[in-house]
Amino acid sequence: MSSFKDVVGHKNIIKYISSAVQADAVSHAYILNGERGSGKRLLANLFAMSLQCQNRAEDGEACGKCQSCKQAQSGNQPDIIKVTHEKPNTISVDDIRTQVNNDIVIKPYSSKYKIYIIPEADLMSAQAQNALLKTIEEPPEYAVIMLLTENAEALLPTIRSRCVMMKLRNIKDQLVKKYLMEQMEIPDYKADVCVAFAQGNMGKA
């Protein structure tokens, strides 16, 4: 997993996250809204890693070396929970109750926060959203919930109103090209083709 310094674009979101971490002014619930490939999971993972870091830098950046960071990088940090679902196109009320509501009452194992990352949050059924809403309305002080979605409008207005909304914008073409040429070592003419195809979405490049 990279650091915030390695993320291409999204500087306003990174600045906001870093300031929140530095000031210890973290909300209980966030929505990261952006199209597929825009970097929602990367930002959520880096945010979670920074919150749990045991030796965080002054700018809010995770150290990447402590036990918590190493666990986060390998996907084994016990207080960073990735919510999954068995059915391909829906997150059921049982998924939310089992993985979030019933688990969130247990205090963090080794960290200050207990963080739940819900990818494809727009796949939650109405029942699942209502179940989650109760937790968002009265969360434990250590809880942080991150909803990742391509369509925030699919979430209940009552959920949206209780979350901090972070919208991932398209990245400038020159930043995409610079990354492709410098980091991926793609030649100029190929980078231009990739940039045209990406349309500001690093995941498509």
List each model region and its residues:
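Clamp-loader machinery-focused feature within the broader ASCE/P-loop NTPase space
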Residues: M1-Q127
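Charged, glycine-rich active-site and insertion segments that engage polyanionic ligands
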Residues: M1-S50, Q71, E141-Y142, N151-A205
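A short beta-strand-to-loop transition that corresponds to the Sensor-1 phosphate-sensing loop
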Residues: E120-A121, L147-A152
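Conserved catalytic/switch belt of AAA+ P-loop NTPases
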Residues: N130-L147
